[in-house]
Amino acid sequence: RDYYASRGLGDVYKRQVRFCDRQLGRVLDLMDELDLWKDTMLIVNTDHGFFLSEHGYWGKGGSPNYEELVHTPLFIWDPRSGRKGVHSPALVQTIDLAPTVLDYFGIEIPADMLGRPLTQTLADDTPVREYALFGYHSMPVGITDGRYTLLRDVKDFDEKTYEYTQMPTHMRAMFSVEEMRTATMAPGFSYTKGTPVMKIEARPNPRFLHTLKGGDMLFDLQNDPHQEHVLEDAEQSDRLLTAMTAAFEENDAPEEMYSRYGLSSTGRRRNK
């Protein structure tokens, strides 16, 4: 903490926020200048949050997925409803953005998309989901209903995980030769439209694997919005674990992921 604080990371972050604020202001000014509000949808969103010493962390990665990381800003202007200055209680995710844009332009939403169009939510707060699943590949996984959040730790670190892909590239590099030597062909998933995929042994960064230090974490966001106290409530934990299993099935998660997180598949998978 002292390392980052002494280097003024907080000040750098503030300057970046001011810069983004100015650039967003330019967009809003242009919307005014060209009178675009009457027929243009505007979406402002971020991909993830950033720790500035909260919970003892800086940046992101290697920490539990607290609200500071996963509860991101989302502002949407929809000229059809014309609602403004309203904070909606609806639980939504970034996967809802693409269906929302498609629906705005009257384009059919593909059956493979799990996101929901937010058209009615933007009009009158109609909910689109009961739960939201979130996390990083092979690391602790979270689920929330908007009030209670459960962070599920990895239960079987010996269970291998795989990357399923038709394009073997990481974010900043191609897959290595060593990784490609583990590749086999798999039949694919419900969303690959009947096409096979490469199944490549994943090699997660070990510093990300033990973020919960061996235990699940349940929080009541209504009474503990800063997630300072782990809640002991078996009923809520069981309910959220059931919802997590259902979300795994909806996402057509591979079988090894159930073992990794100590979940029992009911066999209700999406049709391929």
For each predicted feature, which ranges?
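Single conserved hydrophobic/aromatic residue that forms the stacking wall/gate
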Residues: 2-13
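C-terminal, low-complexity/hydrophilic appendages and adjacent surface loops
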Residues: 67, 137-232, 270-272
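Generic recognition of well-ordered alpha-helical segments
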Residues: 71, 96, 100-104, 117, ...
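Beta-strand elements within well-structured catalytic alpha/beta cores of enzymes
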Residues: 17-20, 24-27, 41-46, 73-76, ...
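Histidine-centered active-site microenvironments of extracellular/periplasmic hydrolases
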Residues: 30-93
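WW-domain-binding short linear motifs
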Residues: 129-133, 255-262
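Polar, surface-exposed loop/tail segments
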Residues: 38-40, 85-145, 229
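Short, solvent-exposed loop/helix junctions and linker helices
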Residues: 6, 88-91, 95, 212-215
